[in-house]
């Protein structure tokens, strides 16, 4: 994929709130197939679009990119055939399959900002949208649909269109659901919702932390603070849809390989292995294994 196409693709992914990693080659010591300026996009399923090197380099970029999606932190990745220690702000990976060259690739996870739906044309709703945007959240007016990655929904409409939105958000599992209302009115609204009690109990009303908020801006601030406080631990800046990266060892070269549909893998040809999946860094290792599996008797994998 040429750079112009890759740039357009990044725009499409950001518009659709799809998390990805931008991988950019910043250093190449020959012999390597990649050159500085080569780049790729790595999706959360391990798919790579673009070019950052051959099979073995690509396998390492895939694994470390998924690690950055999980952590939310950028990484300067050094891939080298030599054994080196990590240095400050640089992850060093020994790759025995490289043809003798060294690559450095900057990995930048691009994760959609938390999505918050707001209902209402009230001063509190307007202040919430304004403050949330400053914080870096994606603030949207609720229009009847809720994205699967929605982080919060806040009803600040003073009695208009409350029930349907609250029920929909609760049923669809939105992590934070808040209702701006007095304690008494909020309790009445929640009581009449046509859902079970366990879901009703998840409504935050009066929405916001008890900080003595009085003005619309202060109330909006208290709600944002509560949204932050309710955020699960360990997900600051990371993509919540990822799990810890699972890897297996390439039986031929000993490299770690991400267990992903995007990684090269084959069913072990020995029927006694009961369909064991064996994972490879590249085509060369895959061909070598399939040509003589008995030479790599210690192969492990997933069924």
Language-model segments: what does each one mean?
Residues 1-152, 164, 176, 183, ...:
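Segments forming oxygen-rich coordination pockets for charged ligands
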Residues 161-174:
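Rossmann-fold NAD(P) dinucleotide-binding segment
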Residues 180-186, 191-245:
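Adenosine-phosphate binding glycine-rich loop
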Residues 248-251, 276:
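Cys/His-enriched microdomains
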Residues 250-253, 266:
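Short cysteine-rich clusters marking metal-coordination/redox-active sites
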Residues 253, 274, 285:
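Short Cys/His-rich metal-coordination motifs, predominantly Zn2+-binding knuckles/fingers
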Residues 256, 283-284, 288:
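Cys/His-rich metal-chelating microdomains
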Residues 260-263, 293:
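Short Cys/His-rich "knuckle" micro-motifs
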């Amino acid at each position: 994929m040429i750079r112009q196409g890759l740039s357009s693709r990044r725009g499409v992914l950001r518009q659709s709130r799809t998390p990805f990693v931008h991988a950019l080659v910043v250093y190449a010591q020959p012999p390597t197939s990649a050159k500085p300026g080569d780049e790729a996009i790595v999706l959360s399923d391990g798919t790579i679009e673009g070019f950052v090197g051959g099979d073995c380099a690509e396998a390492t970029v895939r694994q470390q990119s998924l690690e950055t999606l999980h952590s939310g932190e950028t990484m300067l990745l050094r891939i080298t055939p030599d054994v080196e220690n990590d240095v400050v702000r640089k992850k060093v990976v020994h790759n025995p399959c490289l043809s003798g060259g060294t690559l450095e690739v900057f990995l930048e996870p691009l994760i959609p900002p938390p999505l918050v739906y707001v209902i209402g044309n009230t001063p509190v709703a307007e202040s919430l949208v304004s403050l949330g945007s400053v914080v870096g959240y994606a603030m949207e007016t609720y229009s009847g649909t809720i994205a699967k990655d929605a982080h919060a929904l806040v009803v600040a409409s003073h009695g208009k269109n409350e029930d349907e939105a609250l029920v929909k958000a609760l049923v669809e599992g939105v992590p934070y659901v808040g209702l701006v209302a007095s304690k008494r009115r909020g309790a009445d609204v929640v009581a009449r919702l046509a859902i079970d009690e366990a879901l009703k109990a998840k409504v935050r009303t009066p929405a916001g932390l008890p900080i003595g908020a009085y003005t619309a801006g202060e109330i909006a601030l208290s709600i944002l603070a509560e949204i932050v406080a309710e955020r699960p631990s360990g997900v600051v800046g990371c993509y919540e849809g990822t799990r810890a990266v699972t890897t297996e060892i390439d039986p031929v070269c000993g490299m770690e390989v991400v267990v992903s549909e995007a990684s090269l893998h084959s069913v072990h040809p020995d029927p006694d292995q009961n369909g064991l999946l064996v994972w490879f860094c590249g085509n060369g290792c895959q061909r070598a294994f399939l040509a003589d599996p008995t030479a790599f008797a210690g192969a492990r994998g997933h069924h």
